[in-house]
Amino acid sequence: MIDLCSYLPPMLYGKELDEALTVLPPYAPNIVHADTATRLVALSDIYRVFLSNAMSREIYAKLYLGLLRSLQKKGSQLVTRQYVENQKAIQMEASAGILGGADSFTIIGASGIGKSSSISRSIQLISKTPIIVTDKPYRQVIPCVMVQTPFDASVKGLLLEILRAVDSKLGSDYCAKAMHSRNATVDTLIGCVASVCINHIGLLVIDEIQHIVGQKAGDALARCLMQIINSSGISIALVGTPSVIPFLSDGEYQLARRSLGLYYEPMEYDLSFQNLCTTLYRYQYVKSRTELDESMMRWLYEHCSGNPSVLVSLLHDAQECSILDGQETISYESLSTAYNKRLRMLHPHIKTTRKPSTSKVKQEVVISKAEPTKTIEEFSIVDIVKDAKKAQQDIVSCLKRHISVEEVRI
C-alpha cells in the first residue's frame, strides 16, 4: 500500500511558518506622487495584507494534522470494508460506519476575525500538490476541499456541492450522474458522497456552518454530517460563527463530541493588534504621509472592536475619502468620516467604549448616606382617609404625601 502521507510537504513551525503565512503586497513609497486613479486602484492592495498570528498558526497545525490522519486511514484495510458498506447505501441496503469520525473538529469565531483567510493560507501551504496521483493502485486524492453550507441548510444541496467541488478539481462527473440518477435520494447520495470522500478527498472543510441554525432542515443536515463523518473516515472541519455553538452543544452527544475544536474572539489590544496597525499604516496612498501614534492606535481599536476586517475597511475607506475630497491625509477627521458614512451599518455591532485603564491608582468613590425615610407601617391609611374627609380634601392627594400612589386610567 502506497504511503500517501509522503506526498505532504514538511510541517512548518516557528519563524518559518510565520514567514510562509504572512502576505505583504509590494509597496512603492513614490506611489503617493501618482495620479488619483492610479492611487485609488493601488489602494485595494491593503485588503491583501495578512499577518501570521496565534490563530493562523493554530489553524494551520489543526488542518495539517487532520489531513495527515485522514491520509493515514486511506492506507488501512478498513477503507475497503467501508467502501463496500457505502456501496450498500447507494443500493439502498442496510449499511454501517466502520472508519469512525473522531478526527472531525470545529473552527468557531466571530465574523471578520480572519478565520477564512487563515484557512485559505493554510490550505495553500498544505496543498503544495493540488492533486496527489498514485499509480499502483491508481488514485487521485485532493488534499483539501472547501465548500459552503447552503443558506437553507439543504441536505441534498450540500451533498451535491461536495460532488461538484470534486468534479471541478478532477474533471469527473459525479455530480451529473447523481442528479440524473433515478435513485437520487438523500440516503443514496450520502453513500455516494462518502465513497467519493474515501477515494478522492483528504480534508473536507465546510464553511458557514451557522446556516443550520433556525432552519427546518438544520437537524436533518446535522445528522447527515454525522453520518458522513462516520462513513467517510476523513477529517472534516466545520467552520462558522458562535451562533452555532448552542445548536452543536445542546444537540446529540455524538454530534457534540465530533464538534470539539477551536474557538476565537476578536483581537485584544495587545502587541499583535499593534503590529497589525503598524503594518497596515505603512500602506499609505495619500499625498501627505502621517505617522501612527499610541492615541491613533487606541482610536482605531475602539472603532473596530478588535475586528481585523473592520480595521482594514476603516483604513481603506479613510484614505479613499481623503483622496476623493482633496484632504490627502490620514487624520481623525478622515477616519471619522469613513466610520460614520461608510461603516454605518456596523455601528450596532461595534462597541466604541474605551478599555478600562490598567493603572493601579483607583479613584475613591464616596457614597453619601441616605436620609432615613419613614416606612409605610408608620402611617395609618385609615386615619389619612378620615382626615381627608373631614377637611373635604382629595383622598389621593393626601395619600401621595406619605406613600407612592400610581393612578391607572380605566
Question: In which residue ranges do the predicted regions lie?
Answer:
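The conserved phosphate-sensing helix
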Residues: 304-318
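The feature captures the helix immediately C-terminal to the Walker
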Residues: 120-124, 312
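Trafficking entry modules
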Residues: 1-72, 247, 331-410
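Mid-core helix/loop region of P-loop NTP-binding domains shared across ATPases and GTPases
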Residues: 76-79, 83-90, 96-100, 154-161, ...
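Post-Walker A helix-loop "phosphate-sensing" segment adjacent to the P-loop in P-loop NTPases
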Residues: 125-137, 168-169
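The catalytic "switch" region of P-loop NTPases
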Residues: 193-196, 200-203, 213-214, 223-291, ...
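Walker A/P-loop nucleotide-binding motif
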Residues: 95-120
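Conserved catalytic segments around the Walker B and adjacent sensor/switch elements
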Residues: 131-150
